[in-house]
Structure formats: structure tokens, C-alpha cells
């Protein structure tokens, strides 16, 4: 029979990683049953505040002989009991088992958990309705992600190869040869991506926490991902690695909405007009976007670096499509900008001094009159309006790789502009 297994919320900022636990289990269970595919790393709503780190759950599906099912389930629960970081207050693991074909109701729940806010009670209700078996540890919030990862319709996917460290190295600086990463990236880009930040000359594949992950390599071609990994040199042993199928970098979290429909923790694409000039606070750039249903504050936060320069070029009246997640900032609902597309830009007018009507020379301001620097001709001070080029193009602007959310699709990948342009088609 088909047995689906979902696990979530076993990690904490202090260590552990649900993918590590998942990779160990996948290897162990494969001795007892036949995997139908790679294990799946499913990222859920990135805006939820009580996520442990990247809000990623792990699912896997096996063809299991009926008499082996209890042994497989016991193995999963044993591993979670042994390896989850129960000491952290935000770590509330959940495990879900489901037998047979995935019903539509479970798929719908998965997409809701990706795009909106879902409660533990909702997850329990759906699990009971579809006949899934669930186990809660502590508060058991992890059953939301565990159930959602099982039901997730992975129509668009990428790959991530995760290499893990030997336990004695956990919590120490990772030893990854940066030059080898740049060389590997040059060979494999864009089939693998977000390996490096070419502007800062930094590598992005190695996390910085105390967790077991040594590196994570992302790509759209599994062969290239594996070959790229072989090209990277390490100054410490690799314990083992696991290739995951994942919804990372798919933009599947984004759904078109009107501004008035936006709720806290939504991920959405909206179309609207910039209603007033941008302002800055603490290196963050803000502006207001409105449509016929309402207004929302939009933010390009400091970590987005140069992306903020493009946001600063927006003017009141500009019509744009904006994509991002809704959070609360300073008590105000705020769209955390991931991408934007200028649909219609208003003319930019600057007022300039005219040329000297007598000799064509440059006029200089002298109180309430203008005086020609060349011939001395004087005239009343009157500036003339001149339309100047806008410094924004009709293209999608995105945050840099090190500020990109796990789910956000880079423009370098096929379909990187799809969600934004769908909004253009829907409302244009």
C-alpha cells in the first residue's frame, strides 16, 4: 500500500533540521519499503511568525507491505523522539501518516497552508475528515506542515541537494572552499542558481547556524545539481547528502488579490497606484499603494540593498504590480516587497532655467531675476517645465539572492516572471 509520511517543526534556531531527520528516515525506511520518488521539502507560508526557521516540512511516500506499516510508523516516531529539539519553546513537532491516494480536500488544505494562516484546529479537522493519523509533540503545531507537505500538489518543483556535517562539527564554522563554489557556479548557472552573490563575492550555499547542514545546492536539473556538488571542495568531511524535490523558488505562494482583500500573513500579487512619495526610516524604504478597494503600505527593507534604489525611483501616480508577503510593521499591515513591475509610469517633470534669449548662454539665478553668465542679459525669473526620462524600465525588478525568500522564483529561471505577468493579464 501507499504510505505517505509528513514531518515538521523538529528544528530550532539552536540546531537540528527537519531535512536532516527526514534524510535519515528516508534511508532507514528504504530498507523496509520501496520509495516512490525522492523525499519532498515543502516550504509553507514564509510570513508566519512562529515558524522555527525556514518553515519547511518534509514528506516522503513509500510502497509498503501491509504487515510492515506498524514498524515504519514506529521508526518515524522513534527518530522524532530522539532527534527533535524539544528544549526550544517554538519547537512543537508533528507527524502525520496517510494511506492511499491523496484526496482533493488535502491538496486544498496544503495550498491554504502555503498562502494563508492556518490553525492547529483546522489541521486536526482536515486530518480527521480525510482519515489521516497524526501525532502531536508538545503543542503539536508541526501537524500543520506535516499534513500540508503530504497533500502538496508538487506540479512545479526544483531540486535541493543538502549535504550534512559530522555531529562533532555542528556549531563550528563551516569549511567550504569559496573559490571552488564560484568555479562550479560559473559552470552550472543558471541550471543551479543562488550559489553565490557575484556583487559581494560571497557564497550563499552554506548556512550560518548550529544546524547539521553543511551546504544546500539548488537547481532545476538534478544531474547538474549533483555534478556541481562534486565540484565543490570542503575542508571538513561530508557525513552524507540527500537530494530533495521541493517547491522552493516556484512562486507558488503568490496569489493575485485586490489590496482590500489582503490579510495578515498573506502572500500575494497586487496591482495598484503609488499614492504618495516614498519615505525612509532606518534604511528601510516605504511607499503606499492603492487600488479601488483600499491602500497598503509597501516596504523594501534594508537587507534588499540595491533593490531599494529602484523603489526610490517610483513616483505618485505610477501604476505597478507588486508581489510579496503581508506582515505587521510598527503596527501597520505592510507588504514586504519581493518583486515589482512598472505597468504605467507618470511623466517626470523638472523645472529648469531657460537659455539666454539673446545669446543662448546659461542663465544664473539672481534673487527674483535671471542673469546671463555670458552677455549679462537680465530677465524675470521664470522656470520652464521639462519632461525628463524615467530611470525605470518596463521589466520586473527583484530582490538580490541573499534577500530572496525560499519560495520566490528568481527571474533567471523559466517562469520567473509568470506570477507577476499573470496579474498584468488578469487586470489589464
UniProtKB/Swiss-Prot annotation:
Keywords from the UniProt entry: ATP-binding, Cytoplasm, Ligase, Nucleotide-binding, tRNA processing
EC code: 6.3.4.22
Enzyme class of the recorded protein, top EC level: ligase
Gene Ontology biological process terms, A to Z: tRNA wobble cytosine modification
Localization terms from the record: Cytoplasm
GO terms assigned for molecular function: ATP binding; ligase activity, forming carbon-nitrogen bonds; nucleic acid binding
Catalytic activity: cytidine(34) in tRNA(Ile2) + agmatine + ATP + H2O = 2-agmatinylcytidine(34) in tRNA(Ile2) + AMP + 2 phosphate + 2 H(+)
Pfam family, one: tRNA_anti-codon
Superkingdom of origin: Archaea
One cellular component (GO) term of this entry: cytoplasm
Entry's family note: Belongs to the TiaS family.
Function recorded in the entry: ATP-dependent agmatine transferase that catalyzes the formation of 2-agmatinylcytidine (agm2C) at the wobble position (C34) of tRNA(Ile2), converting the codon specificity from AUG to AUA.
PANTHER family: TRNA(ILE2) 2-AGMATINYLCYTIDINE SYNTHETASE TIAS
Name by which UniProt lists this protein: tRNA(Ile2) 2-agmatinylcytidine synthetase TiaS
Taxon lineage: Archaea, Methanobacteriati, Methanobacteriota, Thermococci, Thermococcales
Gene expressing this chain: tiaS
Amino acid at each position: 500500500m501507499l504510505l505517505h509520511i509528513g514531518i515538521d517543526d523538529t528544528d530550532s534556531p539552536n540546531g537540528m533540521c527537519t531535512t536532516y531527520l527526514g534524510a535519515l528516515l528516508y534511508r532507514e525506511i528504504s530498507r523496509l519499503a520501496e520509495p516512490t520518488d525522492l523525499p519532498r521539502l515543502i516550504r509553507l507560508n514564509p510570513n508566519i511568525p512562529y515558524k522555527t526557521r525556514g518553515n519547511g516540512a518534509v514528506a516522503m511516500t513509500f510502497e509498503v507491505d501491509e504487515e510492515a506499516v506498524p514498524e515504519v510508523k514506529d521508526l518515524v516516531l522513534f527518530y522524532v523522539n530522539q532527534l527533535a529539539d524539544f528544549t526550544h519553546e517554538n519547537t512543537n513537532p508533528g507527524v502525520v501518516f496517510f494511506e492511499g491516494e491523496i484526496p482533493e480536500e488535502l491538496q486544498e488544505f496544503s495550498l491554504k497552508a502555503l498562502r494563508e494562516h492556518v490553525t492547529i484546529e483546522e489541521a486536526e479537522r482536515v486530518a480527521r475528515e480525510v482519515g489521516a493519523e497524526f501525532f502531536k509533540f508538545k503543542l503539536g503545531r508541526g501537524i500543520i506542515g506535516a499534513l500540508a507537505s503530504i497533500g502538496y500538489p508538487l506540479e512545479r518543483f526544483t531540486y535541493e541537494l543538502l549535504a550534512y556535517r559530522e555531529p562533532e562539527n555542528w556549531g563550528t564554522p563551516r569549511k567550504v572552499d569559496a573559490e571552488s563554489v564560484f568555479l562550479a557556479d560559473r559552470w552550472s548557472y543558471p541550471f543551479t542558481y543562488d550559489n553565490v552573490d557575484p556583487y559581494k563575492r560571497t557564497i550563499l550555499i552554506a548556512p550560518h547556524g548550529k544546524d547539521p547542514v553543511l551546504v544546500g545546492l539548488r537547481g532545476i536539473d538534478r544531474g547538474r545539481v549533483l555534478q556541481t556538488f562534486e565540484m565543490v571542495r570542503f575542508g571538513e568531511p561530508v557525513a552524507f547528502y540527500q537530494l530533495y524535490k521541493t517547491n522552493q523558488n516556484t512562486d507558488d505562494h503568490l496569489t493575485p488579490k485586490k489590496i482590500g482583500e489582503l490579510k495578515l500573513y498573506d502572500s500575494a500579487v497586487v496591482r495598484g497606484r503609488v499614492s504618495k512619495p516614498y519615505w525612509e526610516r532606518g534604511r528601510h524604504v516605504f511607499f503606499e499603494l492603492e487600488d479601488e478597494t483600499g491602500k497598503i503600505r509597501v516596504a523594501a527593507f534594508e537587507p534588499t540593498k540595491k533593490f531599494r534604489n529602484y523603489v526610490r525611483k517610483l513616483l505618485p501616480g505610477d501604476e505597478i504590480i507588486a508581489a510579496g508577503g503581508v506582515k505587521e510593521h510598527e503596527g501597520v499591515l505592510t507588504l514586504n516587497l519581493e518583486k515589482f513591475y512598472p505597468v504605467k509610469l507618470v511623466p517626470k517633470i523638472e523645472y529648469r532655467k531657460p537659455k539666454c534669449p539673446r545669446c543662448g548662454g546659461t542663465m544664473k539665478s539672481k534673487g527674483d531675476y535671471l542673469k546671463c553668465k555670458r552677455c549679462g542679459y537680465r530677465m524675470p525669473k521664470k522656470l520652464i517645465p521639462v519632461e525628463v526620462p524615467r530611470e525605470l524600465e518596463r521589466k520586473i525588478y527583484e530582490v538580490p539572492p541573499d534577500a530572496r525568500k525560499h519560495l520566490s522564483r528568481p527571474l533567471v529561471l523559466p517562469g520567473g516572471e509568470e506570477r507577476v505577468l499573470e496579474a498584468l493579464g488578469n487586470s489589464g
